[in-house]
Amino acid sequence: MRPTPRPMGAAALLLLLGLWGRPASAQRAAFPDDFLGLTRCEAGRPVTRLRPDVRDSLLREQLEVHEAVHRRQSDQFGSCEAFMASLGSARRIIEVELPAYCAQWRVAVRQGADSSATRRDFAWRIAAQSGAMENRLEILQRLERECPVRPDQPPP
């Protein structure tokens, strides 16, 4: 004899609907401590902070070059707050991060990092930061096109 199906309890139904009805989230929102270096506005000026646990001098040099690009971008934008407010889309984040990671990549390669692997890693980071992981190959292609080893070299 088969057991008679029992009606789903109200609590079980609410739990099921609560789990099913919530939007899926691939990852949590980023926090400042997630970044090894971060440039933000303080008293209207771009200020960079590197995490205190970053002690490797080679990595610190890379991060300082990367964040210097963001400070220059902010200065060219008119105001730090306006620059930060402009970072509202994946496309805009990619546009801002490409030159910063390009500068960091040049330093890393000069320090002996593998050119291709580092460029690929940086493309993935840009894609993740912008929330556009589906564009990671396109971002890698842009880094290859727009970021020669030496800044005075024309793009291929």
Which residues does each predicted region cover?
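Long, well-structured alpha-helical subdomains associated
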Residues: W105-P156
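Bacterial N-terminal signal peptides
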Residues: A10-L19
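Bacterial N-terminal signal peptides that target proteins for export
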Residues: M1-A11
